[in-house]
């Protein structure tokens, strides 16, 4: 059997656990091989570290960010003869799932595009390890993934309106245990820093000693539980008490239709985030739509 791993680095983000043992020890079975995404341990991504943001899952480690799909292929019964070239054709199959998160931002007041920092997106409940032989997910430990929106993912759609589309490549996401939870697996968190000119009592902009405008800065954040949407997407399958990865060639699109509203008069110094506005906790299912 010949195996190919598609990503390699001195400290690989993607690795196959027990691969060396399998190659050199006949007692090790293919059922002992696990594909895993490296976690960051006690560290946090640079986009999160140092930012005083609400942490809905402080005990969960972050996975290293996967910026492209994960492909895997196996060739069995290969006959390689010494001194002769051997050409192998691999039928690479995508085994990761691509989840697209779509949400909108609306600003009110004197907030310009340059006043908005790139949003930070976090998704919890990510699986980091699964068995290659039977695609059974290891859910004994779940992780979270973080991504900062890139310029091509953040577009202005109108006066004071913006649209974000971000992508996560994952081995599977476990939904929340209940719709009303805002911690644990399956929680989507959005945070972005907003600046707005500071005004004096007469409404005139405040400037510093050098004549530069003084701005107030604040993190706006919100969390939402797309329980029904993750369940409907069928990212996982439960059989005989085990959880299996469900392969899908199609992306899963989770769209939050209720915009995150940012009001200039609420950007004040030394304050906490205003949360997801508007938000109706009695009707959480009305906030998100899904396209598979």
Where are these regions (language model features)?
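Extended, compositionally biased alpha-helical segments that mediate assembly or anchoring
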Residues: 215, 221, 226-292
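Intrinsic-disorder/low-complexity, polar/charged segments enriched in Ser/Thr/Lys/Arg/Asp/Glu/Gln
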Residues: 85-87, 98-100, 161-163
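Solvent-exposed, conformationally flexible loop/turn segments
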Residues: 81-85, 157-159, 233, 257
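Short, low-hydrophobicity acidic/polar segments
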Residues: 3-95
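Tryptophan-paired
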Residues: 3-19, 111-236
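A short, Gly/Thr-enriched small/hydrophobic beta-strand-prone motif that recurs across taxa
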Residues: 92-107
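Intrinsic-disorder/low-complexity loop/linker signature
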Residues: 83, 160, 200-204, 208-212, ...
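Generic marker of residues within folded, mature protein domains
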Residues: 80, 91, 111, 180-182, ...
């Amino acid at each position: 059997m010949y195996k190919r791993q598609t990503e390699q680095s001195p400290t690989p983000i993607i690795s196959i656990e027990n691969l060396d043992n399998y190659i050199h020890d006949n007692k090790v079975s293919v059922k002992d091989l696990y594909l895993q995404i490296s976690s960051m341990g006690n560290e946090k991504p640079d986009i999160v570290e140092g930012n005083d943001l609400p942490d809905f899952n402080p005990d969960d480690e972050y996975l290293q960010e996967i910026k492209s799909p994960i492909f895997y292929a196996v060739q069995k019964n290969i006959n390689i003869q010494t001194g002769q070239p051997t050409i192998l054709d691999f039928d690479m199959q995508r085994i990761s799932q691509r989840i697209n998160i779509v949400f909108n931002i609306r600003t009110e007041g004197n907030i310009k595009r340059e006043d908005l920092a790139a949003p930070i997106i976090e998704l919890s409940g990510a699986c980091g390890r699964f068995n290659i032989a039977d695609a059974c997910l290891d859910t004994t430990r779940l992780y979270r993934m973080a991504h900062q929106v890139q310029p091509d993912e953040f577009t202005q759609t109108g006066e004071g309106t913006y649209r974000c589309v971000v992508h996560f490549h994952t081995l599977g996401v476990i939904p929340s245990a209940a719709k009303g939870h805002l911690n644990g697996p399956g929680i989507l968190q959005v945070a972005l820093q907003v600046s707005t000119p500071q005004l004096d009592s007469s409404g005139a902009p405040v400037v510093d000693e050098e004549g530069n405008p003084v701005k107030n800065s604040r993190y706006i954040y919100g969390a939402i539980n797309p329980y029904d949407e993750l369940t409907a997407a069928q990212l996982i399958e439960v059989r005989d008490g085990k959880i299996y990865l469900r392969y899908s060639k199609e992306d899963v699109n989770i769209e939050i239709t209720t915009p995150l509203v940012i009001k200039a008069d609420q950007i004040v110094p030394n304050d906490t985030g205003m949360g997801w506005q508007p938000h109706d906790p009695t009707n959480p299912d009305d906030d998100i739509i899904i396209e598979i």
